[in-house]
Design a protein with these regions (language model features):
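Short, flexible loop/hinge motifs at secondary-structure junctions
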Residues: 1-93, 161-162
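Intrinsically disordered, low-complexity regions
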Residues: 41-42, 48, 96, 174-176, ...
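Gly/Pro-rich turn-and-neighbor structural signature
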Residues: 1-3, 11, 15-18, 30-33, ...
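Conserved helix-loop functional segments at active or binding sites
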Residues: 45, 63, 78-82, 86, ...
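General secondary-structure edge motif
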Residues: 15-19, 52-56, 82, 96-100, ...
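Active-site-adjacent "gating/activation" loops or surface patches in catalytic cores
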Residues: 61-113, 186-199
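Generic amphipathic alpha-helical segments used as scaffolds and interaction surfaces in large
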Residues: 23-30, 103, 107, 123
Length: 222
Protein backbone atom coordinates (compact mmCIF):
# COMPACT_ATOMS: atom_id res chain seq x y z
CA UNK A 1 0.00 0.00 0.00
CA UNK A 2 1.46 3.30 -1.08
CA UNK A 3 -0.57 6.21 0.29
CA UNK A 4 -0.81 9.38 -1.72
CA UNK A 5 1.29 12.09 -0.12
CA UNK A 6 0.13 15.69 0.01
CA UNK A 7 1.65 17.75 -2.75
CA UNK A 8 3.72 19.72 -0.22
CA UNK A 9 5.50 16.52 0.87
CA UNK A 10 6.10 15.04 -2.56
CA UNK A 11 9.65 14.98 -3.82
CA UNK A 12 10.16 16.33 -7.28
CA UNK A 13 11.08 13.70 -9.84
CA UNK A 14 12.99 16.25 -11.90
CA UNK A 15 16.69 15.43 -12.10
CA UNK A 16 18.90 18.05 -10.52
CA UNK A 17 21.85 19.26 -12.58
CA UNK A 18 25.28 18.05 -11.54
CA UNK A 19 27.27 20.65 -9.57
CA UNK A 20 29.17 23.02 -11.81
CA UNK A 21 32.05 23.00 -9.31
CA UNK A 22 32.95 19.38 -10.09
CA UNK A 23 35.94 18.83 -12.39
CA UNK A 24 34.91 17.72 -15.84
CA UNK A 25 36.54 15.50 -18.43
CA UNK A 26 35.32 15.85 -21.99
CA UNK A 27 35.44 13.06 -24.53
CA UNK A 28 34.34 13.60 -28.11
CA UNK A 29 32.99 10.59 -30.01
CA UNK A 30 33.12 11.44 -33.69
CA UNK A 31 31.31 9.44 -36.37
CA UNK A 32 33.43 6.86 -38.15
CA UNK A 33 32.20 8.12 -41.50
CA UNK A 34 34.26 10.89 -43.09
CA UNK A 35 31.70 11.42 -45.83
CA UNK A 36 27.98 10.81 -46.24
CA UNK A 37 27.36 7.03 -46.18
CA UNK A 38 24.34 7.50 -48.46
CA UNK A 39 25.62 9.68 -51.30
CA UNK A 40 29.29 10.24 -50.51
CA UNK A 41 28.81 13.99 -50.05
CA UNK A 42 30.89 16.19 -47.76
CA UNK A 43 29.76 16.37 -44.11
CA UNK A 44 29.30 19.70 -42.30
CA UNK A 45 28.74 20.40 -38.60
CA UNK A 46 25.11 20.29 -37.43
CA UNK A 47 25.61 20.84 -33.71
CA UNK A 48 26.40 18.37 -30.94
CA UNK A 49 24.40 16.24 -28.50
CA UNK A 50 25.81 16.44 -24.97
CA UNK A 51 25.17 14.05 -22.08
CA UNK A 52 26.75 13.82 -18.64
CA UNK A 53 27.71 10.83 -16.51
CA UNK A 54 28.71 11.07 -12.85
CA UNK A 55 31.76 8.94 -12.04
CA UNK A 56 33.72 8.31 -8.84
CA UNK A 57 37.51 8.23 -8.94
CA UNK A 58 38.70 6.05 -6.07
CA UNK A 59 41.41 7.34 -3.76
CA UNK A 60 44.84 6.05 -4.69
CA UNK A 61 48.11 5.80 -2.82
CA UNK A 62 51.34 7.31 -4.04
CA UNK A 63 54.84 7.49 -2.59
CA UNK A 64 56.46 10.92 -2.45
CA UNK A 65 60.23 10.50 -2.50
CA UNK A 66 62.13 13.46 -1.08
CA UNK A 67 65.71 13.84 -2.27
CA UNK A 68 68.08 16.36 -0.66
CA UNK A 69 71.29 16.67 -2.66
CA UNK A 70 74.43 17.51 -0.69
CA UNK A 71 76.81 20.06 -2.15
CA UNK A 72 80.41 20.49 -1.02
CA UNK A 73 82.53 23.59 -1.42
CA UNK A 74 85.55 22.88 -3.61
CA UNK A 75 87.61 25.38 -1.63
CA UNK A 76 86.79 24.75 2.07
CA UNK A 77 84.82 21.47 1.94
CA UNK A 78 81.80 23.12 3.60
CA UNK A 79 78.68 21.01 2.97
CA UNK A 80 75.36 22.59 2.03
CA UNK A 81 72.05 20.72 2.14
CA UNK A 82 68.40 21.71 2.38
CA UNK A 83 66.77 21.05 5.77
CA UNK A 84 64.51 18.05 6.29
CA UNK A 85 60.87 18.98 5.57
CA UNK A 86 58.61 18.89 8.60
CA UNK A 87 56.27 15.93 9.04
CA UNK A 88 52.95 15.74 10.90
CA UNK A 89 54.31 12.77 12.90
CA UNK A 90 58.04 12.53 13.55
CA UNK A 91 59.71 9.40 12.14
CA UNK A 92 56.52 8.35 10.36
CA UNK A 93 55.89 7.98 6.64
CA UNK A 94 52.24 9.07 6.96
CA UNK A 95 51.51 12.13 4.84
CA UNK A 96 49.03 14.81 5.94
CA UNK A 97 46.46 13.79 3.33
CA UNK A 98 46.54 10.16 4.48
CA UNK A 99 46.13 11.20 8.12
CA UNK A 100 43.17 13.40 7.25
CA UNK A 101 41.59 10.47 5.40
CA UNK A 102 42.03 8.13 8.38
CA UNK A 103 40.69 10.60 10.96
CA UNK A 104 37.74 11.67 8.80
CA UNK A 105 36.88 8.04 8.11
CA UNK A 106 36.90 7.13 11.80
CA UNK A 107 35.17 10.13 13.37
CA UNK A 108 33.06 11.65 10.60
CA UNK A 109 32.10 8.50 8.67
CA UNK A 110 32.17 6.07 11.66
CA UNK A 111 34.51 3.73 9.78
CA UNK A 112 36.39 1.60 12.30
CA UNK A 113 40.15 1.34 11.97
CA UNK A 114 40.08 -2.39 11.27
CA UNK A 115 37.70 -1.77 8.38
CA UNK A 116 39.95 0.97 7.04
CA UNK A 117 42.86 -1.45 7.30
CA UNK A 118 40.96 -3.96 5.17
CA UNK A 119 40.12 -1.29 2.59
CA UNK A 120 43.75 -0.17 2.32
CA UNK A 121 44.88 -3.79 1.98
CA UNK A 122 42.59 -4.20 -1.03
CA UNK A 123 44.31 -1.14 -2.49
CA UNK A 124 47.69 -2.83 -2.12
CA UNK A 125 49.00 -1.17 1.07
CA UNK A 126 49.27 -3.04 4.37
CA UNK A 127 48.42 -0.64 7.21
CA UNK A 128 47.64 -2.55 10.38
CA UNK A 129 45.00 -1.51 12.86
CA UNK A 130 47.76 -0.87 15.42
CA UNK A 131 49.53 1.50 13.03
CA UNK A 132 46.33 3.41 12.30
CA UNK A 133 45.66 3.58 16.04
CA UNK A 134 49.08 5.12 16.74
CA UNK A 135 48.52 7.68 14.01
CA UNK A 136 45.11 8.54 15.46
CA UNK A 137 46.62 9.12 18.89
CA UNK A 138 49.40 11.27 17.45
CA UNK A 139 46.92 13.42 15.52
CA UNK A 140 44.85 13.84 18.69
CA UNK A 141 47.93 15.30 20.39
CA UNK A 142 48.51 17.64 17.45
CA UNK A 143 44.93 18.89 17.71
CA UNK A 144 45.02 19.57 21.46
CA UNK A 145 45.74 23.33 21.05
CA UNK A 146 42.75 23.65 18.72
CA UNK A 147 40.64 21.62 21.17
CA UNK A 148 41.57 23.98 24.01
CA UNK A 149 40.78 27.08 21.96
CA UNK A 150 37.40 25.60 21.01
CA UNK A 151 36.63 24.95 24.69
CA UNK A 152 37.51 28.53 25.62
CA UNK A 153 35.25 29.86 22.88
CA UNK A 154 32.24 27.68 23.70
CA UNK A 155 32.49 28.31 27.46
CA UNK A 156 32.80 32.07 27.24
CA UNK A 157 30.43 33.94 29.57
CA UNK A 158 26.91 33.73 28.19
CA UNK A 159 24.42 31.04 27.29
CA UNK A 160 25.60 27.49 26.69
CA UNK A 161 23.46 24.47 25.85
CA UNK A 162 24.58 21.20 27.43
CA UNK A 163 23.70 17.53 27.23
CA UNK A 164 25.32 14.12 27.56
CA UNK A 165 25.28 11.16 25.21
CA UNK A 166 25.76 7.50 26.19
CA UNK A 167 28.63 5.90 24.30
CA UNK A 168 29.46 2.16 24.35
CA UNK A 169 33.16 1.60 25.03
CA UNK A 170 34.93 -1.73 24.72
CA UNK A 171 37.13 -2.60 27.68
CA UNK A 172 40.62 -3.66 26.56
CA UNK A 173 41.28 -7.36 26.91
CA UNK A 174 37.84 -8.37 28.16
CA UNK A 175 35.76 -7.99 25.03
CA UNK A 176 32.98 -6.48 27.17
CA UNK A 177 31.47 -3.06 26.65
CA UNK A 178 30.49 -0.45 29.19
CA UNK A 179 28.62 2.81 28.83
CA UNK A 180 30.71 5.96 28.94
CA UNK A 181 29.55 9.53 28.31
CA UNK A 182 30.18 12.30 25.84
CA UNK A 183 29.33 15.67 27.33
CA UNK A 184 28.19 18.13 24.67
CA UNK A 185 28.42 21.89 25.07
CA UNK A 186 26.96 24.11 22.36
CA UNK A 187 27.24 27.83 21.79
CA UNK A 188 24.44 28.94 19.49
CA UNK A 189 23.02 32.45 19.87
CA UNK A 190 21.38 32.75 16.48
CA UNK A 191 17.96 33.19 18.09
CA UNK A 192 19.33 36.31 19.78
CA UNK A 193 20.49 37.68 16.40
CA UNK A 194 24.10 37.10 17.36
CA UNK A 195 26.66 37.04 14.57
CA UNK A 196 29.06 34.86 16.57
CA UNK A 197 29.68 31.50 14.88
CA UNK A 198 28.04 28.46 16.41
CA UNK A 199 30.38 25.86 17.90
CA UNK A 200 30.27 22.51 19.69
CA UNK A 201 32.75 21.20 22.26
CA UNK A 202 32.81 17.55 23.36
CA UNK A 203 34.29 16.11 26.55
CA UNK A 204 34.60 12.43 27.42
CA UNK A 205 34.07 10.75 30.79
CA UNK A 206 34.05 7.04 31.71
CA UNK A 207 30.72 7.40 33.55
CA UNK A 208 27.97 9.90 34.39
CA UNK A 209 29.26 11.20 37.72
CA UNK A 210 28.60 14.88 38.30
CA UNK A 211 32.22 15.62 39.09
CA UNK A 212 33.04 15.57 35.37
CA UNK A 213 30.72 18.40 34.23
CA UNK A 214 31.71 20.33 37.36
CA UNK A 215 35.32 20.16 36.25
CA UNK A 216 34.48 20.96 32.62
CA UNK A 217 32.49 24.05 33.66
CA UNK A 218 35.00 25.27 36.22
CA UNK A 219 35.42 29.01 35.73
CA UNK A 220 32.35 29.34 33.51
CA UNK A 221 29.74 31.99 34.31
CA UNK A 222 26.48 32.40 32.48
Amino acid sequence: YDPVLPSALRQSSARKPLPASLPRQTRVIRPEEECCPVCGGELSSLGCDVSEQLELISSTFKVIETQRPKLACCRCDHIVQAPVPSKPIVRSYAGPGLLVHVITGKYADHLALYRQSEIYRRQGVDLSRATLGRWTGAVAELLEPLYDILRQYVLMPGKVHADNIPVPVQEPGSGKTRIARLWVYVRDDRNADSEMPTAVWFAYSPDRKGIYPQNYLAGYSG
